[in-house]
Design a protein with these regions (language model features):
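Catalytic core of pol beta-like nucleotidyltransferases
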Residues: 1-45, 52-57, 68-117
Length: 117
């Protein structure tokens, strides 16, 4: 009986930690979308496990941005300065993405921002 109670506490703690991780990723996505749109992005997507709703405790945030004249390293630097430490992010410039990655972004991704033309 004590063993089951202990297991229940472990499961509850893991669920709480996972919920906190999902919330942290959601805040990062929202904040970074604000920053990228202010810089003039045409479109911002989230894709990967977060977009599919399959977040694990080790999941990172996969995002793509269209319409900015920055390399992936420059975009990650912008993200780091905007979000601070503890960054769990892969930020891809749409223009540099392979055809396969673009297909993945379009099929599983969610548009977080799209500039009105």
């Amino acid at each position: 009986d004590q063993y089951l109670e202990h297991e229940d506490r472990i499961v509850a703690r893991r669920e709480k930690d996972l919920a906190a991780h999902k919330e942290r990723l959601a805040r990062q996505a929202a904040r970074l979308t604000e920053v990228l749109s202010a810089l003039g992005a045409r479109r911002v997507w989230v894709f990967g496990s977060f977009a599919r709703g399959h977040v694990r405790s080790d999941s990172d945030l996969d995002m793509a941005v269209e319409g900015l004249p920055y390399s992936q390293d420059q975009l990650l630097g912008i993200a780091e300065r905007s979000l601070g430490g503890g960054l769990t992010l892969d930020l891809v410039p749409w223009e540099a993405a392979s055809a396969l990655l673009r297909e993945r972004i379009l099929s599983e991704g969610r548009v977080l921002y799209e500039r009105e033309e």
